[in-house]
A protein has these predicted regions:
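N-terminal alpha-helical interaction blocks
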Residues: 2-159
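Cys/His-clustered metal-coordination modules, chiefly Zn-binding fingers
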Residues: 153-271
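Extended, helix-rich structural scaffolds rather than catalytic motifs
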Residues: 275-276
Length: 277
């Protein structure tokens, strides 16, 4: 993990010189990665226990190992990490998250419910009233990140077993979240999807939409920007969803998809402009 962190920070520095307009975001990401590793190292409790006897049934039944809709978890440590993340943002932009930090101190921010709601796309944002949209986006990002150290522990312990089990769904087999980015790698050009919620990567069909399961080649497409062919946006014209894809096979680089997700935000904007979600 220490080497991965070191490599990620080097990549961030490289991208800051190539794409200076993302400099501030990349700086924040660097701080988050350092803090993530710190919290992961000091986390002693098992926050997301896995019933190993049910693992095989869950995987073959298309169910993620962790069920956030019905599970009850002690989220004390993730909540501490969430508060620390808000403090990073407040330090960089005073006043940005002050209101949310005050809500936490006053007991008016139900962190546990917000986490549960983040796994249910039908739920509305409880904090939306009177708070700037940019701050809500930041809070959503930090809610997701706050679980990452604890979920990485699950990935470390069970990731290899899950990878061997042949998961075929487009959502994460560990936590159930949908991917935002993936990569093409190995000589055979295999496709892997990446979960920004827990950090797990799993193999997935090249010609298939991870969101609706569409396999009709004529309704699946991709586009890229001239000069940035190592990045592309895969789109599905059935469900109008998209996913970013990284292909570093020519350059032989190793992709850190946490960093690449930030470094390719312009592709998200482009996909949205083209009518994809």
């Amino acid at each position: 993990m220490a080497k991965m962190l070191k490599d990620a920070l080097k990549t961030i520095e490289k991208y800051k010189s190539i794409t200076p307009h993302y400099g501030e975001l990349l700086d924040i990401l660097g701080e988050i990665l350092i803090l993530r590793e710190e919290y992961r190292r000091k986390m002693k409790k098992v926050i997301f226990p896995i019933d190993e006897g049910l693992m095989e049934k869950k995987i073959f039944g298309g169910l993620p190992l962790i069920d956030f809709s019905t599970g009850t978890f002690d989220l004390t440590e993730p909540k501490e990490y969430f508060t620390a993340l808000l403090e990073i943002a407040e330090k960089r932009a005073p006043g940005e998250t002050k209101e949310v930090l005050q809500m936490i101190q006053d007991g008016n921010f139900n962190y546990e419910k917000m986490i549960s709601d983040s796994f249910n796309s039908l739920q509305d944002d409880d904090i939306a009233e009177g708070i700037d949209d940019d701050v809500i986006d930041l809070v959503d990002l930090f809610l997701e990140e706050s679980l990452r150290p604890a979920l990485e522990k699950v990935v470390e312990k069970y990731g290899k077993s899950v990878a061997k089990a042949g998961w075929t769904e487009g959502y994460c087999p560990i936590c159930g979240k949908e991917p935002k980015i993936g990569e093409i790698r190995e000589e055979e050009g295999r496709r892997f999807l990446f979960c920004t919620q827990c950090g797990f990567e799993w193999r997935f069909m090249r010609i298939k939409c991870p969101f609706c399961g569409n396999e009709e080649q004529q309704t699946l497409a991709y586009f890229s920007i001239e000069g940035e062919e190592k990045y592309r946006v895969d789109v599905c014209n059935e469900c109008k969803r998209y996913i970013k894809t990284v292909d570093f096979r020519e350059t032989k680089e190793e992709a850190n998809l946490d960093v690449e997700d930030i470094a390719t935000l312009h592709l998200d904007m482009l996909a949205n402009e083209e009518g994809y979600d």
